[in-house]
Amino acid sequence: MKWLLLLGLVALAEGLIHKVALVKKKSLRQSLWENGLLEDFLKTHSLNPASKYFPTEATTLSANQPLVNYMDMEYFGTISIGTPPQEFTVIFDTGSSNLWVPSIYCSSPACSNHNRFDPQKSSTFKPTSQTVSIAYGTGSMTGVLGYDTVQVAGIADTNQIFGLSQSEPGSFLYYSPFDGILGLAYPSISSSGATPVFDNMWNQGLVSQDLFSVYLSSNDQSGSVVMFGGIDSSYYTGSLNWVPLSSEGYWQITVDSITMNGQSIACNGGCQAIVDTGTSLLSGPTNAIANIQSKIGASQNSQGQMAVSCSSIKNLPDIVFTINGIQYPLPASAYILQSQEGCSSGFQGMDIPTSSGELWILGDVFIRQYFTVFDRANNQVGLAPVA
């Protein structure tokens, strides 16, 4: 009888996990390359991954989320907004906090090729007079804020504030595989003081635990998932190791060291890192990354990527991140990205001066290897090897 009760409780707990399936698609970079536009794009758009974090010029009405920095993203999920629901493909981004999608008020070419929200077709939409501006590349996405019901993984998140874009300059966004972005970081970095989607879910009692978790599949187009309100142990092996946040805003933690063959190659004496599902690569200080690129034999090609010989993967050593005393090795098969164009490094350089020293971004290259729990209740991140 006790076993039946226990099984029932387990089934109940499992049922309270709300899962969003993520689909792996061609990245914006791949689409531009296939359409013969990548080289021209790279000549006119400066890739600056650092500009996403700790913006110095952002105001309460401006969010600094450069869309050009999402050009290598491959994982996307579906949400709906309004009554009846209107569907959108979004990036679930733990490196930002706002939700925004294109609207019918946007006549830019980029918007015309994507799903656009029509407030007039939603009986639950509530307008505001607030504007929002999200900077990227050589222009910015401008729009207005409104409230409506957002459905995510079967959760009806009512009275959710979100951005409706009115202008998206930059023809390259015409080819982007996503409509908008759903931010999952803390409210403190949200533009316009907008309540993030997950906070609104928790405040309304729509999830059973104040956490969400992410599994990114390495190979398949399907299989990746974001889970709201719970943890599914079938996605990882061993036990979760918990890492306290060093700062609450981004999902920021302390890294003890980064080594190769037992020798330090970066992060001497420790460094800070943001765990970010909205960054595809693994980013760090320019000088440190240049050292790593040299050690793995990477050199820049005409597509702006650091090319690596595919045949070298089997001979390259692990790069080990030690976090809270636990080692997290990345094999070459993880940090060397393979595509139809060839092989390239999964590392990219960026310099973000912070009061706590050098900053790294643990993007999808890292998260594909380690199931990640984002625990808001205890302000910590849980990591375990993927199953």
From Swiss-Prot:
It comes from Sorex unguiculatus (Long-clawed shrew). This is Pepsin A. Its main location: secreted. Residues 1-15 form the signal peptide. Its EC number is 3.4.23.1. GO terms for cellular component: extracellular region. Residues 75-384 form the Peptidase A1 domain. GO terms for biological process: digestion; proteolysis. Transmembrane segments: none annotated. It is found in: Secreted. PANTHER family: BETA-SITE APP-CLEAVING ENZYME, ISOFORM A-RELATED, PEPSIN A-3-RELATED. Disulfide bonds join C106-C111, C267-C271, C310-C343. Belongs to the peptidase A1 family. The active site is at D93, D276. PROSITE patterns: ASP_PROTEASE (PS00141), PEPTIDASE_A1 (PS51767). Residues 16-61 form a propeptide. One of its GO terms (molecular function) is aspartic-type endopeptidase activity. Keywords: Aspartyl protease, Digestion, Disulfide bond, Hydrolase, Phosphoprotein, Protease, Secreted, Signal, Zymogen. It is an enzyme of class 3 (hydrolase). The gene is PGA.
